[in-house]
Amino acid sequence: VLGHVLDRNPDLALVFPDYYLVDPFGEVYSHERRKKLYVDNHSLDTPPHGACTLIRVSVLKEVGGYREDLKAQDGFDLWSKLFERYKLTNVNLPLFYYRQHGSNLTANSHRIFDARRQIKMDHIRDKLKSLHPVIAVIPCRRNFDFVTDLWDEKIGGKTLLEREIEVCLSSELFDHVVVASDNPLTEETVRKYSDDRLGFVLRDSQSTIRSASIVPTLESVVSRFSPELSGITVIRYLQAPFVKVDSIEEAIATLVMSGADSSIAVEEILSQVFRRTRYGMEPVNPRGDFRSDFDSLYRDLLCCVATYSRNFRTGSLTGRSIVSYVMPPAECMIIDTEQKLQVARVLAGGGH
């Protein structure tokens, strides 16, 4: 079937099918379907399952073949080399069975995360040279959190702000790291660091209320370095203290690689979600034997946003086109209650 598609369409470089998911006992429990590329699906940020993908040998040779230095995600690497240069397609027929069990490579998340990030960074390294400045903004506020001056709370012997500053400064991708706060005392923390990339901006207290958009603050910050609002801005929320620098850099890489307006960290919602109707509750993501990639629901982890600074001109944080990436579960904790703050202190060690 796949060979026939390539034979009839010489302009195509790659084709892939739908597939069945099979449990450890050999029972089919789901038909995984991908919406038709270029017709119903115009976002090519998600590669196909690599178990049954047909590619022209000539094209495979042109792009250098599969990488042998990767321990996982070689299919994603191949996809990253193809989707911008060649025409690809998919067939809505399930042509293979995929059995999921604990020993699948898919279950080895660390290898997958590391390989995926390496592929993305290698892919965008040259592109990033024309996208400066890359600015990290760490917003802080005195009020409107569950505790006053949340940024000054300590976990693992350091304040949340100190932890975030050090993580951002550890990345060579950032030209500037800016702390924006309505409390002048925040600047004292900033002054502890000698890195020339680090700066402080005093923001208006009215901009910190929950109903206020953060975009005017971001536009003001970025305009200091780029009046024309060029480059990329990354918003890092210190309420997520376990996010590592690799995940922050992946936000940038995902954005640049995709051609979208912004990228966010998400988590797939695996449990059922309901909405209220006139007749009671209705499932938004009904479970069944047949599902497509459009049936999945995701929640914003509120950890990190990478966006092109030009979006601020229209008052938008994300722009119209948003892509996502998955963050390791250990990094996803958000401190928005006193209880979670205490849990974070236990996880970080070192008490206050």
Residue ranges and their predicted role:
Residues 17, 31-117:
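Conserved nucleotide-sugar donor-binding catalytic segment
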Residues 26, 216-220, 229, 238-331:
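Conserved core of the sugar-phosphate nucleotidyltransferase
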Residues 18, 27-46, 50, 121, ...:
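Short, flexible, basic/aromatic active-site loop/helix in glycosyltransferases
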Residues 13, 68-70, 80-97, 124-131, ...:
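Catalytic donor-sugar/metal-binding loop of nucleotide-sugar-dependent glycosyltransferases
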Residues 185-234, 242-246, 250:
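Short phosphate-binding loop-to-helix
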Residues 129-148:
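N-terminal nucleotide-binding beta1-loop-alpha1 segment
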Residues 167-174:
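Short, acidic, metal-binding catalytic loop of nucleotide-sugar glycosyltransferases
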Residues 1-29, 225-230, 253-265:
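Conserved donor NDP-sugar-binding/catalytic core segment of glycosyltransferases
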